[in-house]
A protein has these predicted regions:
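Conserved donor-binding/catalytic core segment of Leloir-type glycosyltransferases
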Residues: 104-120, 126, 143-144
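A short helix/loop element that forms part of the nucleotide-sugar donor recognition site in Leloir-type
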Residues: 89-103
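Short hydrophobic "strand-cap" motifs at the C-terminus of beta-strands
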Residues: 34, 59, 80, 112-116, ...
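A short, basic/aromatic alpha-helical/loop segment that forms part
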Residues: 117-122, 133, 138
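Proline-centered loop/turn at the N-terminus of a beta-strand
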Residues: 28-32, 55, 75-76, 108, ...
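Extended catalytic core of nucleotide-activated donor transferases of GT-like folds
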Residues: 1-52, 61-62
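Nucleotide-activated donor-binding/catalytic signature segment of Leloir-type glycosyltransferases, i.e.
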Residues: 136, 147, 153-215
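Donor nucleotide-sugar binding/catalytic pocket of nucleotide-sugar-dependent glycosyltransferases
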Residues: 52-93, 170-174
Length: 215
């Protein structure tokens, strides 16, 4: 190694950090981890890894409780929640907020934030949304997918076409030219920007800044 860390901290999923448990240098650094715990129960192998860390943090009380219920010898320190930024506060006027984004103020939007990967059940999501629309017959309900396309996962145009959702699926676009974010119906991976009119608007997923999405 070109450096000798005293503390190694991992804030990521188990499969991205478990190798450090087996590191030949493990005895020479303090290992602090903050694993993503969003389901219960956790895989026992994951719990064994968490139990070997010197310090363990959680994103939420749910994560803390899940880990400690499965192993009460984990060196748990505290819940380290994200900063309480006003970016995450609800919009004061939802109808006006929708209007500012060019969306019908009376619309009902069901949203999801997840990367377009094969393990994410986008086909099930869109098929279920189609059934919901058929049952409710409500013209003002839309599915908002904050994700990436194209990516390593699903073929969005195919899923939308198969389920007849061309006018019901909204996505986040970000312009490479003016850097502004907009929300629009899925048309293609690239389209004209609503702000600067350049043909450089592309679907932007998890990396779009929260402040930009709020704008």
């Amino acid at each position: 190694l070109d450096f000798k860390p005293d503390i190694v901290m991992d804030i990521r999923d188990w499969w991205m950090m478990e190798f450090e448990q087996r590191s030949p240098f493990r005895d020479f650094f303090h290992w602090a981890i903050m694993p993503t715990v969003d389901a219960s129960p956790q895989n026992q192998q994951w719990i064994n890894t968490y139990n070997s860390a010197d310090s363990v943090f959680a994103y939420s009380e749910f994560g803390r409780d899940t880990m400690l219920e499965q192993c009460d010898t984990i060196n748990f320190i505290d819940v380290a929640s994200p900063a309480a930024s006003d970016v995450f506060a609800p919009a004061a006027d939802k109808k006006q907020h929708k209007a500012n984004m060019g969306i019908n103020p009376e619309s009902i939007i069901l949203g999801t934030v997840m990367r377009n990967q094969k393990r994410k059940l986008y086909p099930d999501l869109m098929a279920s949304f189609r059934k919901f629309l058929d049952q409710t017959q409500d013209p003002n309900v839309f599915l908002y997918c904050h994700t990436y396309y194209p990516d390593v996962g699903w073929d969005f145009p195919k899923l939308i076409h198969e389920n007849g959702l061309a006018s019901r699926v909204l996505v986040t676009y970000k312009c490479k030219n003016c850097k502004k974010v907009s929300v629009d119906f899925f048309q293609n991976s690239i389209q004209n920007c609503q702000h600067c009119q350049s043909h450089t608007n592309y679907i932007k997923g998890i990396g779009a800044a929260e402040t930009q999405k709020r704008e």
